Regions:
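Amphipathic alpha-helical recognition patches that constitute DNA-binding helices
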Residues: 169
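Bulky hydrophobic segments
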Residues: 1-165, 184-185, 189, 193
Length: 199
């Protein structure tokens, strides 16, 4: 929870500057097209803040000088569905004992899977219902965003550090992409894009 709140705080600090940089070309495009929609603008701002929160959560806190000096090599977990083996090995679940079901559901391995899915739910929802992308494009963009995150973790924040300080995991890639698609699958008919209001 502390890490989550710290990530939101960091995103809040960075948001005004990045929003200002994005706003200039955005508003210029709207003026040239002679159309403007405050709803899309608000959703766009919320989406930008959400993306900053995700990036802060997956890349921060950075290792300190002592930790960075000990980093070497780049760690990657390439076994698909390793989280299933982790669940069976680490949780207290005993199928014959119903008392272990609830503790197993709140085990770290389960929460990690759930959080990886939830992390990109807003991402896919924005692409599908605000941008109007079809399911295939939502899947590709969600996969690309997740791959960007995992590549950053594999390379030590794109070679800023000598080694990985977070694990690059193929399961995270799959679960993030699933999260990006999940809400889009609930309503498979073509979504109505937020209309442009002319002025």
């Amino acid at each position: 929870m502390t890490n989550l709140l710290g990530s939101i705080r960091l995103a809040a600090y960075a948001f005004p500057l990045i929003a200002a940089l994005v706003a200039v070309p955005f508003f210029d495009r709207q003026v040239r097209a002679r159309c403007f929609n405050w709803v899309r603008t608000v959703f766009g701002g919320l989406f930008l803040f959400y993306v900053l929160c995700v990036l802060a959560l997956v890349f921060f806190p950075l290792p300190d000088a002592a930790q960075a000096a000990r980093l070497s090599g780049h760690e990657i977990q390439l076994v698909p569905f390793q989280f299933v083996a982790d669940f069976l090995r680490e949780t207290p679940l005993v199928l014959s004992d119903a008392r272990t079901y609830l503790p197993a559901l709140f085990d770290r391995t389960v929460l990690q899977v759930v959080c990886n899915i939830l992390m990109l739910l807003p991402f896919g929802m924005y692409l599908r219902y605000v941008c109007g992308l079809d399911l295939g494009k939502v899947a590709l963009v969600s996969l690309a965003f997740s791959a960007f995150i995992e590549l950053g973790q594999l390379t030590g924040l794109f070679f800023m550090f000598r080694g990985s300080y977070r694990l690059c995991d193929v399961d995270d890639l799959m679960l993030n992409t699933l999260g990006g698609l999940l809400l889009s699958l609930i309503h498979i008919s073509e979504p109505t894009r937020l209309g442009m209001i002319s002025y």
